[in-house]
C-alpha cells in the first residue's frame, strides 16, 4: 500500500540551491525511498517562467515518487498543508548594502512567510531556513507564527557541520563517515564555533589523534568559518550544491532519525548552555521519531565559552536589529 504523499514547500524555487535540491527531493533523498512527495514551489512573480522550466525538467525525470507539483508566487498557496517547508529564498546582499539593510529586507520576507505558515501549514510542519542570515530569518519566521510550536523552526548549520567533518577527516586521515560527536555552535556565519573536543573516529579521540591546538585555532576554525567566501572566490558563485546537500541531510535526519549520532541544527534555545531563550542557535542534537533533542550537559571550557559567547553576541545584535519589525 503506497503511503499518502507528503507536501514539501520550497521557496526560492528558481534559484541555484533549489536547482540542486528539487531533483533530490523528488528522488526520495529527503523523506525516504517509499515516500511520495508533492512539491509546492514558491518564487517571485518575475521568476515564474524559470520555475516552470525547472518543473519541465522534473517532469522529464519521470520520478516515481513525485506525486504532484504546485507553482505559485503566493506563500499561502505554497505552504498550504505543508509537512516540510524549506525556506531557501532570501534577499542576497548586494554591493554597498549594509548588514542592517540586509536584515530588514529579509525581515519583511520572513514575517510574511512565517505568518503564511502560521495560517495554512500543517501544525507539525518542519521548517528549515536556508536563506541567510539563516538563524535570524528563522527567528523572525518563528516569531511571526505564534500558533505553531517554536520547535518546528530550525536554521541550517549542517553545511558548517559537514565542512568541519571534511576538514577533520583530511587532517586525521580517518574516513569522514567514521567521525562522530562533532558539534558546531552558534550562528551560520564566520563567527560559528566548530568544536571537536568530544569527537571520535573509529572510537579514538580526535582531539588526541590530531593533538594540535594551533591548527585548531588558526586553521580549522577559520577555514570552516570562511569556507563559503573561499568558494565564492574560486567559483565566482556561492555554494549551491553543498548547501542543498546539507538541507537534505538536515531534514532527512530530523524526519528519519540519526541512530544515536550527533548532528548540528540551529534550534530555538531553551536557556541551556547560557544561550537566552528563543535565540536560534546551533547546537549538537540527536534525532529520533521525528523530533530533535539537544545533547545536554557537555562541559564548556574557557576557550569554548569565549567562542560561544562571540557568536551569541552577533545573534543578539541581529535580533535587536529586527526587533522593531516584529510586532
Curated annotation (Swiss-Prot):
EC number(s) given by UniProt: 1.1.1.37
GO molecular function term, any single one: L-malate dehydrogenase (NAD+) activity
One GO process term, biological-process aspect: malate metabolic process
Keyword terms of this UniProt record: NAD, Oxidoreductase, Tricarboxylic acid cycle
Active-site positions on this chain: 188
Reaction equation(s) it catalyzes: (S)-malate + NAD(+) = oxaloacetate + NADH + H(+)
Residue sites binding substrate per the record: 93, 99, 132, 163
Residues at which NAD(+) binds: 12-18, 106, 113, 130-132
Pfam family, one: Ldh_1_N
Lineage: superkingdom: Bacteria
Family: Belongs to the LDH/MDH superfamily. MDH type 2 family.
General function of this protein: Catalyzes the reversible oxidation of malate to oxaloacetate.
Name of the molecule in the record: Malate dehydrogenase
Organism of provenance: Burkholderia pseudomallei (strain 1710b)
